[in-house]
A protein has these predicted regions:
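Non-catalytic alpha/beta scaffold blocks inside enzyme catalytic domains
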Residues: 1-81
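Segments of small-molecule ligand-sensing domains
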Residues: 83-85
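Short, intrinsically disordered, charge-balanced linker/junction segments flanking boundaries
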Residues: 89-96
Length: 96
């Protein structure tokens, strides 16, 4: 498939990045990097931050936790959440 593409953006697999995910019931859980990304892969937040900088957009993140912090500020269901509150088991967010 990559041979047919004009460009390829390598993205890190779930075990290669830190961050969060939200499942179907609204449980928000941490994911923690188990090993370094392969080749030129990097977390999506990092790729989008770099692309945004090239486009002159005013956001700059250095870690997945900073992205989650901004998500919590902007999305009401995540408003009171942070990495510390999520702990090891995660939390179910308050559905509006």
């Amino acid at each position: 498939m990559a041979q047919a593409a004009d460009f390829v953006i390598p993205s890190a697999a779930y075990a290669e990045k830190d961050g969060t995910f939200t499942n179907f019931e609204g449980r928000v859980q941490r994911i923690r990097k188990a090993f370094e990304p392969i080749g030129e892969s990097k977390p999506a937040w990092q790729t989008l931050t770099e692309l945004g900088a090239e486009l002159g957009l005013a956001f700059s993140y250095n870690h997945a936790e900073e992205v989650f912090h901004d998500l919590a500020k902007e999305v009401p269901a995540f408003r009171d959440l942070n990495y510390k509150k999520l702990g090891d088991q995660g939390l179910v967010w308050n559905k509006p």
